[in-house]
Swiss-Prot record:
Residues 1-25 form the signal peptide. It comes from Escherichia coli O6:H1 (strain CFT073 / ATCC 700928 / UPEC). This is FKBP-type peptidyl-prolyl cis-trans isomerase FkpA. The gene is fkpA. It is found in: Periplasm. Pfam families: FKBP_C, FKBP_N. It is an enzyme of class 5 (isomerase).
Amino acid sequence: MKSLFKVTLLATTMAVALHAPITFAAEAAKPATTADSKAAFKNDDQKSAYALGASLGRYMENSLKEQEKLGIKLDKDQLIAGVQDAFADKSKLSDQEIEQTLQAFEARVKSSAQAKMEKDAADNEAKGKEYREKFAKEKGVKTSSTGLVYQVVEAGKGEAPKDSDTVVVNYKGTLIDGKEFDNSYTRGEPLSFRLDGVIPGWTEGLKNIKKGGKIKLVIPPELAYGKAGVPGIPPNSTLVFDVELLDVKPAPKADAKPEADAKAADSAKK
């Protein structure tokens, strides 16, 4: 359940940079048959060159589509012309002009992306608040002082977990529109983690049930990922989790032996 843990911007950026070409290639149309491939390429170098170009082209195509979402529409023909001219060493722009143009473009993309993120965050915050207020009116639902909204489906038995305990859970996580972003049931494997090692909404929420218990958590963004969001979870998203607490493993008690050894050492000095 990596969605519940912190995701750094650097890690996210690296993941996109390293895996984008492979992902785009996977989204491509059905590949040519083996016979067609053999006819099209004389050797592996030709085939590799073509594969590299195809992967680059799909990456660029995807980039153009993403920029269109920001209101930026680049001329695809000019993009292709720029690539061809660069290979022919006949660029219409000097190196300095290219650098200045790309710097200005980068600033434009960042500005547009920031504006879109702020708009999306505001929209998500308003919709999330409305959803939480509606859910809070349902039977058996409680709202804590932090804003966490929850419904205990089954209380469970034993002691409630503490921050330092390790819990084992099954769960399903969705956005308020029902879009699923995480599910241990479909993976066929429950998740084990220290209770204070996840988002605050989970740390607080699971203390309301015991082993064998089930709970529905509706978590406001300030107890989840806030304005930043993470991949798959937009900024200021209210998150909905159905959680089953399978087991609670208390934190191991501190070993008393080191303390005894320390006392013995002090006695020896005296």
